A protein has these predicted regions:
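Hydrophobic transmembrane alpha-helices of multi-pass small-molecule transporters
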Residues: 24, 28, 42-118, 224-361, ...
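Membrane-embedded alpha-helical segments and adjacent helix-loop junctions characteristic
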Residues: 94-181, 339-409, 413
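Alpha-helical transmembrane segments and, especially, the helix-loop junctions at the ends
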Residues: 153-163, 180-218, 236-240, 383-399, ...
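Membrane-interface alpha-helices at helix entry/exit sites of multi-pass transporters
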Residues: 139-144, 174-186, 216-226, 409-418, ...
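Helix-loop-helix connectors at the membrane interface of multi-pass transporters/channels
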Residues: 169-175, 210-213, 402-408, 440-452
Length: 484
């Protein structure tokens, strides 16, 4: 598609789809139609056979089931469910704006926008070319490019990582006349693995940071101990060792190829600047700024948005406003932003109805008084569920549940939070449908004429994932486990 002109996306449909569900959602919260909200509360009161908590749970269950059955309509479903939570009085109208975690929304939007310009600069392709040129054979190319994809994914969205690295693998495979299937699968599962390594690595990491008030450096060192970043690196090395032996027979020689030309270095410098600023903000006490509401609470989001806007403004001088806007909007995942906005309100509804407290009590009852048993249950249950359902709604739901469990048990929730994140992030690697990055990678292979069976995918993904989860499971408990 050409940039600019008549072929540019219609902004209304880009942001809200067709029909414009986002507009319908926000207009539904406009104070004028108060009779509608009174009507909704009257309906709830009329359902005398169903206590409020059960009604909220029913809305949540239908929402979750619909999101699983209709994955392309997850955002629409979440927004409609959010409207129902308000309509039935579970979330007061005046609290809707405050229930949305704007730090998470701004962090995702800012990072996505900047990363899109970074990808468009061709810098990732250039870096991948350099790695490939140094490798002796296909086996080492696969290992190296999976490690490279993992490194990129620690700071860039998983799907974006696959979109920027997988085409390089496919080109190399065609040039050397071998199947790129193993290489692209390795890129996809390595990208998912590293998503939990840093605050900006994945939506679930951003959500955890927003919920638990973690800063960028807390993922590197927390409570004076090695953080998730280092734990994930050890898990990555262990899984890569398996990958090396799995690929051992792929010893075809690799020839040098021409390096991709970088067309713009500015987005790369701005991405580095954003990461450096996030590191600095982790150590500094951020003051409140008048024109930035809740500055201290939303520091991460403001930093990401400021760097994205500055990069956008500079790029408009080089490419023109319309072309730059097209680049950013073409890959800005408005779907996820609307999905999260709706989920924040839905979760507030079930929290206010008392559902989360009851679920936390149920987990506490099953896990007893043993923190280790509870941690084990959370990790492996998260691995299982995330293999079949999207981890974003799962983590969004479980974060307040984990907080409730820790409160009931009277323990520090850190080990449970980290266990939830690692299990939910890594569990998506088990199946081809468990993570968006997997679906993206398989789609790219299919488009290139390569079919991938579930058996072939899982012959790589299951051992790779279980090794990573087991290493992470043991190390998280070793550093943060509660003993005695």
């Amino acid at each position: 598609m050409k940039r600019g002109g008549k072929e540019s996306p219609i902004l209304l449909e880009k942001f809200f789809g067709s029909p414009p569900w986002g507009i319908i959602f926000f207009v539904s919260f406009f104070p004028a139609p108060m009779k509608v909200f009174r009507f909704g509360r009257n309906i709830r009161k009329g359902l005398i056979f169903m206590p409020p908590m059960y009604l909220a749970l029913l809305i949540f269950a239908i929402t979750y089931g619909t999101m699983i059955a209709l994955p392309n309509y997850r955002a629409h479903t979440a927004l409609l469910a959010a409207a129902l939570m308000v309509l039935f009085g579970f979330v007061p109208l005046g609290q809707v704006f405050h229930e949305i975690n704007w730090n998470v929304i701004m962090t995702i939007a800012g990072t996505m926008g900047l990363v899109t310009l970074f990808i468009d600069s061709m810098m990732p392709a250039r870096l991948a070319d350099r790695i490939i040129d140094k490798m002796p054979d296909v086996k080492w190319v696969t290992v190296a490019i999976s490690l490279f994809a993992g490194l990129i994914s620690a700071f860039v969205d998983n799907v974006s990582t696959v979109l920027m690295v997988a085409p390089i693998a496919i080109v190399v495979a065609k040039k050397l006349d071998f199947s790129p299937v193993k290489m692209v699968i390795a890129i996809s599962i390595a990208s998912n693995l590293q998503g939990a390594a840093t605050l900006v690595g994945d939506t679930t990491s951003i959500m955890l940071a927003g919920h638990a008030n973690l800063n960028f450096m807390d993922f590197f060192f927390f409570q004076g101990k090695p953080g998730l970043f280092w734990i994930i690196q050890v898990a990555m090395l262990a899984s890569t060792l398996f990958l090396y032996f799995y690929m051992k027979k792929d010893d075809k020689r690799v020839e040098a190829r021409n390096l991709t030309k970088v067309n713009d270095y500015f987005p790369s410098w701005m991405l580095l600047g954003m990461v450096f600023s996030l590191v600095l903000a982790s150590f500094a006490e951020v003051p409140e700024i008048i024109f930035l509401p809740n500055t201290a609470k939303n520091t991460t989001g403001y930093i990401c948005m400021i760097f994205m806007v500055l990069t956008f403004l500079i790029e408009t001088r080089k490419k023109g406003f319309q072309d730059t806007l097209h680049i950013v909007l073409s890959d800005l995942d408005v779907f996820t932003l609307l999905l999260l906005s709706g989920l924040f309100i839905v979760i507030a509804g079930i929290r206010n109805a008392g559902v989360i407290d009851q679920v936390a009590k149920l987990f506490t009852k099953v896990g007893g008084k043993s923190p280790f048993l509870m941690y084990t249950l959370l990790v492996w249950a998260s691995v299982f569920f995330s293999a079949f359902i999207d981890n974003i709604p799962y983590v969004a739901t479980m974060l307040p549940v984990v907080a409730g469990i820790a409160g009931n048990m009277g323990i520090d929730p850190t080990v449970l939070y980290f266990g939830l994140l690692s299990g939910a992030t890594l569990g998506g690697n088990l199946t081809p449908i468990g993570a968006s990055a997997n679906i993206t990678g398989i789609g790219m292979l299919r488009k290139g004429g390569y079919e991938v069976s579930n058996r072939r995918f899982m012959s790589m993904s299951i051992p790779y994932t279980l090794i990573a989860v087991l290493v992470g499971y043991l190390l998280i408990w070793h550093f943060f486990g509660i003993r005695g």
